Curated annotation (Swiss-Prot):
The gene is ileS. GO terms for biological process: isoleucyl-tRNA aminoacylation. GO terms for molecular function: aminoacyl-tRNA deacylase activity; ATP binding; isoleucine-tRNA ligase activity; tRNA binding. It catalyses: tRNA(Ile) + L-isoleucine + ATP = L-isoleucyl-tRNA(Ile) + AMP + diphosphate. Its EC number is 6.1.1.5. Belongs to the class-I aminoacyl-tRNA synthetase family. IleS type 1 subfamily. This is Isoleucine--tRNA ligase. Catalyzes the attachment of isoleucine to tRNA(Ile). As IleRS can inadvertently accommodate and process structurally similar amino acids such as valine, to avoid such errors it has two additional distinct tRNA(Ile)-dependent editing activities. One activity is designated as 'pretransfer' editing and involves the hydrolysis of activated Val-AMP. The other activity is designated 'posttransfer' editing and involves deacylation of mischarged Val-tRNA(Ile). Monomer.
Length: 861
């Protein structure tokens, strides 16, 4: 008789190899064809609803690993909420306006693009944005997201733009909009103002220039005394309009080479060394306040400017006397405005080239950086040059063009964010943060910005519905409301197609007045900041339960959303806010095409499978920056195999011939009850971690449980599963335990590795089951009696097992045994022992067990 044929070996179509790269897309097609998302939505429609609002990615280019991290985390949240008994709402979105799309369209054929009308340019930009959405949508779906991608919002939707115009009108009603000539970040390459969130900093070689201005008149200084000044922007010197000193700092008058100089006293020694002025002699100290009303001669031109008192002056760099040019610095601008020096000399045009404002033919037509050498040479001719050096300095750059950014004064529209800061501060207190430091971070970002520049000098954006009368903006509610009504009636593009009179309120037209339309568009952060209107328009719960984006969005989307929400609805558009870190290469370096270390999430999906990428996301502490690369992914693959084979395949293979019934109908042995109890404890722990969005600890708990099961319970039940009769009550009870583990854990695994969970579900032999694992709500928890006793028993056994297995391993290394089944375990107990030695056979696969004395090791036969 062939005894092997009598064994009930595991049988399942759930393969050892996941074949994720081919199977995943089959499951995605299955979910789509069976309309699984829609069925889940209907199934949960009467449950409490939770809304995760999607911060829109920019519709340009392929998705990167940061996009993948973000969208997968959002998918984890939504699936977690479903598992916890909530209905979920998630509407994907795309940010479609802005400069990068304009650049992408124009660079294909610059000459042709330049010849087009505004409407034609805008149409090309729109078509490009739509094409990018189609590409990104397919790429996001490859990640296994449980979303309805047939319904999504775009910031170029007509309805979206109309809501944004209403937001603008609301800001006007609250007297929050004003126009001013003041410095903002300016990109000479992009020829537009930029937001703080569009700036990145790079270390570049910068010139440090020391020069002098000669005193004309002063209460404490002699005429001809030299004011020593430091600057890193020599090109701004022609527009110098003041020098700032700190009123409370101590300044020093000293002599060198028969000339008198003034410098901050605390910097004198270091500057003397730097310049090589070893024989400089100190004369007297002067307080900064005493220098007020001092006047000096411009370093290049025949004009006289004042010394002003400013608290922004620093004592740890430069000379303590600050060159002030209100057109090219915010501190400079506010200081001059405070002292009624209201004229800001804007010497550069939008391309960063000197215009004729200065009436300086040599500078006119020069790019600002090329003017530095010309200006330094002139300083030398005027005997105002002292010293120059090169050093590394963090300078602002345009995050899109990667080119230097300057501060430049221009006429822009601003929102008075300072006027809403008290309301913002009150509302932030109501928001839940996983990390309270992030609450402080958001508050700091919101409260440090007094004004928000919302105008952009670009074609591709939502037009600002503003009309000028004799070059003065008509910021009254009646005029703007009428203009917006016309735009809503005839379409946003009508602004670029119809005459000015079409948008003018007939009641407001005055004879002899020249009217014109605003040519600027609203900045993209004003677009994306108003995306909460998607929820309001769809009559969904507002505010959203959660906003989840990268940590850079504290100065970006979180910031603009908070401001827009307060302006339009008097509340923040989110109840909870969490942020994730950036993705780095496996060595901890920032990813860069130039370094060749960019990790492509789509290539990872093609090589390993989306579930492997998702499992990587599960493995990271998403609140901080995390590394990814081939070596890291290979470790994830090993973890995946353990879950797939040691847990799922073992269970499914041993459920063959199982008659599914009620848990109460089975006769469970002691070891079965312990596993049921431990499964219940795990499920409760996992739910707690999910509520905290702690997916890493979820995975750790699952992995620990799998190792425990495979190292003990699965080992000791193999004889029963393989050798006992199909209908043996003990065997059937153990199958019931395996089934219980599967049904309790498959929902959690579906959060993280949904393709694998679906694969397991389709090979799960339950006769009447939901068509997809995504529709499986999970069974009720089966409780076993004497939980405390089971815990105590398990702890005692674990202690015995650990000691015994350590001794066994030592015996194996010493050559005493070669296999575990050669061991006889002798267990010493007394009346207080929690474990009965006669029941140890249920806990171990050792050959024999018998009671005896501690440390008594049986001899090898």
């Amino acid at each position: 008789m062939n005894l092997k044929k009598t064994l009930l070996m595991p049988q399942t179509a759930f393969e050892m190899q996941g074949k994720l790269t081919t199977k995943e897309q089959q499951f995605q097609a299955f979910w789509q064809s069976k309309r699984i998302y829609q069925k889940l939505h209907r199934q949960n429609k009467d449950k409490p609803q939770k809304i995760l609002h999607d911060g829109p990615p920019y519709a340009n280019g392929n998705i990167h690993v940061g996009h993948a991290l973000n969208k997968i985390l959002k998918d984890f949240v939504l699936r977690s909420w479903n598992l916890q008994g909530f209905g979920t709402v998630f509407i994907p979105g795309w940010d479609c306006h802005g400069l990068p799309i304009e650049h992408a369209v124009s660079k294909k054929d610059p000459q042709h693009y330049a010849s087009l009308s505004l409407s034609e340019k805008r149409d090309l930009c729109k078509q490009f944005a739509l094409s990018q959405i189609a590409i990104q949508k397919a790429q996001f779906q490859r990640l296994g997201l449980l979303n309805d991608f047939s319904k999504y919002y775009k910031t170029i939707d007509e309805s979206f733009q109309q809501n944004e115009l209403d937001l603008f009108l609301q800001a006007v009603k609250k007297d929050l909009i004003f126009q001013a000539l003041k410095p903002t970040y300016w990109s000479p390459v992009s020829r537009t103002s930029l937001a703080e969130a569009e700036i990145e900093y790079k270390e570049v070689k910068t010139i440090g220039l020391y020069l002098t201005f000669t005193v004309v008149q002063s209460a404490v200084l002699n005429s001809g005394t030299k004011l020593l000044v430091w600057t890193t922007t020599p090109w701004t010197l022609p527009t110098n309009q003041a020098i700032a000193v700190h009123p409370q700092f101590e300044y020093l008058l000293f002599t060198y080479n028969n000339e008198q100089y003034v410098v901050l006293a605390s910097l004198f020694e270091s500057l003397k060394t730097k310049f090589g002025w070893t024989d400089a002699i100190q004369v007297q100290t002067i307080s900064g306040s005493q220098l007020q009303n001092t006047t000096y001669k411009h370093c290049l031109y025949d004009k006289v400017n004042p010394v002003l008192l400013g608290n922004h002056v620093l004592c740890n760099e430069g000379t303590g006397l600050v060159h002030t040019s209100p057109a090219y610095g915010l501190d400079d601008f506010y200081l001059c405005k405070q002292n009624k020096l209201n004229e800001a000399l804007v010497s550069l045009d939008e391309k960063g080239v000197f215009n004729d404002t200065l009436n300086d033919p040599v500078l006119t037509g020069l790019f600002y950086l090329k003017a530095n050498d010309v200006i330094i040479e002139r300083l030398k001719q005027h005997h105002n040059f002292v010293f120059s050096e090169s050093f590394l300095h963090r300078e602002p750059h345009d995050w899109r063009s990667k080119t230097p950014v300057i501060y430049r004064a221009s006429k822009q529209l601003f929102i008075k964010t300072k006027s809403i800061q008290s309301k913002l501060k009150r509302q932030i207190k109501r928001v839940k943060f996983v990390n309270n430091k992030n609450k402080e971070r958001l508050q700091e970002m919101l409260l440090q910005r007094a004004e928000w520049c919302i105008s952009r000098q670009r074609v591709w954006g939502l037009p600002i519905p503003l009309i000028y009368a004799d070059n003065q903006p008509l910021l009254d509610v009646t005029t703007i409301k009428y203009t917006i009504q016309q735009l809503k009636k005839y379409g946003i593009d009508s602004w670029f197609e119809k005459d000015i009179n079409f948008f003018l309120n007939p009641k407001k037209i005055q004879p002899g007045v020249e009217y014109k339309k605003e040519t600027d568009t609203l900045e993209v952060w004003f677009d994306s900041g108003s995306t909460y209107n998607v929820l309001i328009s769809n009559k969904l719960n507002f505010p959203a339960d959660l906003y989840l984006e990268g940590s850079d969005q504290y100065r970006g989307w979180f910031n603009s959303s908070a401001s827009c929400g307060i302006i339009q609805t008097d509340q923040l558009p989110f109840k909870s806010l969490i942020s994730h870190g950036f993705t780095l290469d496996e060595h901890g370096n920032k990813m860069s095409k130039s370094l060749g270390n960019v990790v492509d999430p789509l290539k990872l999906c093609d090589q390993y499978g989306a579930d492997i990428l998702r499992l990587w996301v599960t493995n990271v502490d998403w609140q901080v920056d995390n590394r990814i690369g081939d070596n890291i992914i290979k470790q994830i693959v090993e973890q995946y195999r353990r879950i797939r084979n040691s847990l799922l395949r073992f269970i499914l293979g041993n459920l063959n011939h199982f008659n599914f019934g009620e848990m109460k109908d089975y006769r469970f042995a002691l070891e079965d009850k312990i596993v049921i109890h431990k499964t219940n404890a795990l499920v409760q722990e996992l739910h707690q971690w999910l509520k905290q969005y702690n997916f890493l600890n979820c995975l750790k708990a699952i992995n620990k449980f799998v190792l425990w099961l495979s190292g003990w319970y699965f080992e000791i039940i193999k004889d029963t599963l393989y050798c006992d009769a199909k209908t043996n009550p003990n065997r059937v009870a153990k199958q019931a335990v395996l089934n219980y583990i599967f049904t309790q854990l498959i929902g959690f695994l579906n959060i993280f590795i949904p393709h694998t969970a679906e694969d397991a579900w389709q090979n799960y032999l339950l006769p009447k089951k939901p068509v997809s694992v995504n529709l499986f709500a999970g069974p009720a928890m089966f409780k076993v009696a004497n939980v405390k006793g089971l815990d105590r028993l398990h702890e005692s056994f674990s202690a015995i097992k650990d000691r015994a297995y350590a001794a066994i391993e030592q015996a194996r290394q010493n050559g005493v045994i070669t296999k575990n089944n050669q061991v006889v375990l002798t267990l010493g107990v007394d009346s207080t022992s929690a474990i009965d030695p006669t029941s140890c056979k249920t806990f171990s696969s050792l050959a024999k067990r018998k009671p005896g004395k501690y440390n008594e090791w049986p001899q090898r036969n």
